[in-house]
């Protein structure tokens, strides 16, 4: 999977972005939030990505922040929400506004998004209410700039058989305690001891 791409912007529209990486142009579908955060054409950028594979196409979705990507992935876990609907939701709501709407059971805010009716809004809240609190806590505990270390440690702990929610709490607590000044190896060792 492609975690992110870094290169120069060659084309930018409110829903699409083309980034030149080593002479190859990657086309990404983006939200309005990502569009607003990007600089002009020819500027260098780092875009977090999600590759969606279907029988007919391979589509890259791009996000300016790891938080936006995490919200996108959470939305994809909801029954009936595909990548196009998820990107539409993230175009209308920031990750923080989405998390707030889910935690406060605010169906009105979700229904304001084009294509989201009352049942879909209720389903999003029902299926994500437990997960978003964890994601929100994780994001507030996770020091900025440490996303790669955090994700790498979670992946390693998962492969070692540690339950995802336990690993998330443990890794976030260790990162908070060490204020981000820790290597991946030390983080994994401490998590296994804890």
UniProtKB/Swiss-Prot annotation:
Main location: cytoplasm
Entry note about domains: Has three domains with a flexible linker between the domains II and III and assumes an 'L' shape. Domain III is highly mobile and contacts RuvB.
Family, per entry: Belongs to the RuvA family.
The protein's name in its UniProt record: Holliday junction branch migration complex subunit RuvA
Region (Domain III): 150-194
GO cellular component, one term: cytoplasm
Origin: domain of life: Bacteria
Gene Ontology MF terms: ATP binding; four-way junction DNA binding; four-way junction helicase activity
Cellular localization per UniProt: Cytoplasm
Region (Flexible linker): 144-150
GO annotation terms (biological process): DNA recombination; DNA repair
Alphabetical UniProt keywords: Cytoplasm, DNA damage, DNA recombination, DNA repair, DNA-binding
Entry function: The RuvA-RuvB-RuvC complex processes Holliday junction (HJ) DNA during genetic recombination and DNA repair, while the RuvA-RuvB complex plays an important role in the rescue of blocked DNA replication forks via replication fork reversal (RFR). RuvA specifically binds to HJ cruciform DNA, conferring on it an open structure. The RuvB hexamer acts as an ATP-dependent pump, pulling dsDNA into and through the RuvAB complex. HJ branch migration allows RuvC to scan DNA until it finds its consensus sequence, where it cleaves and resolves the cruciform DNA.
Spans annotated as Domain II: 65-143
Subunit and partners: Homotetramer. Forms an RuvA(8)-RuvB(12)-Holliday junction (HJ) complex. HJ DNA is sandwiched between 2 RuvA tetramers; dsDNA enters through RuvA and exits via RuvB. An RuvB hexamer assembles on each DNA strand where it exits the tetramer. Each RuvB hexamer is contacted by two RuvA subunits (via domain III) on 2 adjacent RuvB subunits; this complex drives branch migration. In the full resolvosome a probable DNA-RuvA(4)-RuvB(12)-RuvC(2) complex forms which resolves the HJ.
Region Domain I: start-end pairs: 1-64
């Amino acid at each position: 999977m492609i975690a992110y791409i870094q290169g120069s912007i060659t084309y930018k529209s409110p829903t699409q972005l083309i980034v030149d990486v080593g002479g190859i142009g990657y086309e990404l579908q983006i939200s309005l939030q990502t569009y607003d955060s990007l600089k002009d054409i020819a500027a260098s950028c780092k875009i977090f990505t999600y590759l969606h594979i279907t029988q007919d196409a391979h589509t890259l979705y791009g996000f300016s922040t790891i938080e936006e990507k995490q919200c996108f992935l959470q939305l994809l876990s909801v029954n009936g929400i595909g990548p196009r609907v998820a990107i539409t939701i993230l175009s209308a709501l920031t990750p923080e506004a989405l998390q707030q709407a889910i935690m406060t059971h605010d169906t009105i805010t979700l229904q304001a998004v084009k294509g989201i009716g009352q049942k879909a809004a209720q389903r999003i809240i029902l299926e994500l209410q437990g997960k978003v609190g964890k994601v929100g806590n994780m994001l507030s505990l996770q020091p900025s700039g440490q996303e790669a270390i955090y994700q790498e440690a979670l992946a390693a702990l998962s492969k070692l058989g540690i339950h995802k929610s336990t690993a998330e709490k443990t890794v976030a607590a260790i990162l908070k305690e060490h204020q981000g000044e820790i290597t991946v190896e030390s983080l994994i060792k401490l998590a296994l001891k804890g």
